[in-house]
Every structure is written in structure tokens, then in C-alpha cells.
UniProtKB/Swiss-Prot annotation:
Stored SUPFAM superfamilies: Ribosomal L27 protein-like (SSF110324)
Organism: Escherichia coli (strain K12)
Domain of life assignment: Bacteria
GO molecular function, one term: rRNA binding
Gene: rpmA
Alphabetical list of InterPro entries matching this protein: Ribosomal_bL27, Ribosomal_bL27_CS
Full protein name: Large ribosomal subunit protein bL27
Keyword RNA-binding in record: yes
Quaternary structure annotation from Swiss-Prot or TrEMBL: Part of the 50S ribosomal subunit. Cross-links to the 23S rRNA. Cross-links to the A and P site tRNAs.
Location of region: Disordered: 1-20
Family recorded in the similarity comment: Belongs to the bacterial ribosomal protein bL27 family.
Length: 85
């Protein structure tokens, strides 16, 4: 009789769902007000002109225009702003 003894249990075998973070609209792209530009954890990118910051640090356009990425300030922070077309 070909029998296989039962395998033991394991405490592994789980993984969380991907959160789909990252830049959604790149520099030079046209956006409409309300469009999500970046989904992020913390402030890797900061909100510049015509850009709002949600409570989960999502950056979104407050006006229609083109996305502009810039590095400024003494700490070389990355800012995202919207230039009106």
C-alpha cells in the first residue's frame, strides 16, 4: 500500500496585496483638475503650485495644466507643480 505520511503545517504562505504606488502622471503631461499625480507613502514628493496633498500623501492636480517636477530648497526636496496651459 503506497501511503504518504501527512506533511506538517507551516506558519508561512501569506503576502499582502500590492498597493499600486508610484508616479501616475509624468513631467510634461497634461492633467485635469482632480487627477492623481503620485500615490506615495510619506512625502517623497511635495506639493507645489496648484497641487494638493491628500491625507494618505497622494498628490493631485487642483487645476488643469501640465505637470512639472522640480528640485529646490536647501534639502533638495522634489516638488510637483501644475503650470496652467
Amino acid at each position: 500500500m503506497a501511503h504518504k505520511k501527512a506533511g506538517g503545517s507551516t506558519r508561512n504562505g501569506r503576502d499582502s496585496e500590492a498597493k499600486r504606488l508610484g508616479v501616475k502622471r509624468f513631467g510634461g503631461e497634461s492633467v485635469l483638475a482632480g487627477s492623481i499625480i503620485v500615490r506615495q507613502r510619506g512625502t517623497k514628493f511635495h506639493a507645489g503650485a496648484n497641487v494638493g496633498c491628500g491625507r494618505d500623501h497622494t498628490l493631485f492636480a487642483k487645476a488643469d495644466g501640465k505637470v512639472k517636477f522640480e528640485v529646490k530648497g536647501p534639502k533638495n526636496r522634489k516638488f510637483i507643480s501644475i503650470e496652467a496651459e
